[in-house]
Amino acid sequence: MGRGRVELKKIENPTNRQVTFSKRRMGLLKKANELAILCDAQIGVIVFSGTGKMYEYSSPPWRIANIFDRYLKAPSTRFEEMDVQQRIIQEMTRMKDENNRLRIIMRQYMGDDLASLTLQDVSNLEQQIEFSLYKVRLRKQQLLDQQLLEMHSRVCNKRIYRFSILPYLIHYIEIIKF
């Protein structure tokens, strides 16, 4: 019968933690050695203890420094470091391409550069322009409705004001007549 799983959490007792680290470190290095022998793999393991002490293992005949150098020179995109300048150039190129694409679209919206478009492209462009025109007209109508409401409100307020002071005006006119 196998052992139960150990709950993975930090061991609070420093002595127990150090003993567990030592045993598990030895087990890890043993597994690395077995993998190197069985699969003829170049393996390097670097482990730092909780106190900062470094332990390392490298599969014979390699040294850890050789394996680490090989790791740094690996042609994988995960490990390659791109030069900052190269990244900036790539981003600038991407942005220029995007800018050119958007300029072409804008010229097409303005009715220019249509010669390169297919019938389907022209139909799609027409639908997009019609939809844009619909949205513009809808917004225009909203603004006109808003202005109409504001003007109506002002007229009503002026009428109320006139009617509220009308009795006083009539009274003063009658006083002036006498």
Curated annotation (Swiss-Prot):
Keywords: DNA-binding, Nucleus, Transcription, Transcription regulation. SMART domains: MADS. SUPFAM superfamilies: SRF-like (SSF55455). GO terms for biological process: positive regulation of transcription by RNA polymerase II; regulation of transcription by RNA polymerase II. One of its GO terms (molecular function) is protein dimerization activity. It is found in: Nucleus. InterPro entries: MADS-box/MEF2_TF, MEF2-like_N, TF_Kbox, TF_MADSbox, TF_MADSbox_sf. CDD domains: MADS_MEF2_like. It comes from the Eukaryota. GO terms for cellular component: nucleus. Probable transcription factor. This is MADS-box transcription factor 31.
